Amino acid sequence: LAKLSIYGNDYDTHAGTVVRDYIHVVDLAKGHLNALDYVLSHQGVDAVNLVTGNGYSVLDVVAAFEKASGAKVPYQIAPRRAGDIAVCYADATKAKNLFGWSAQFGIEEMCRDSWNFIQKNPNGM
């Protein structure tokens, strides 16, 4: 098994790796359906974040995936990528206020469901 490359471990974050906002595909799909219902009954345009509003470090995701799969994820620390910022996540308040949507799944469920999909579909879709 190849090793996962984690780009940088010296960021000013709780785990030293970059922090990002990850979203479950089901939450994203439901968010798009809520947004579609909203635009069909309202005029104008608006930008809305479909996000969890929670930041997880790369090492948080690795740990959650290890828990979901029951296997260690081999990884190596690689040099930082040019331009990567330490923390990037967004606010989902507007989606909640405009069309009643908020993410329901956390990182543990995301990794569990990803692992289950991989197990059931070893060759992809």
Language-model features: where?
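C-terminal substrate-binding subdomain of Rossmann-fold SDR/epimerase-dehydratase oxidoreductases
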Residues: 1-125
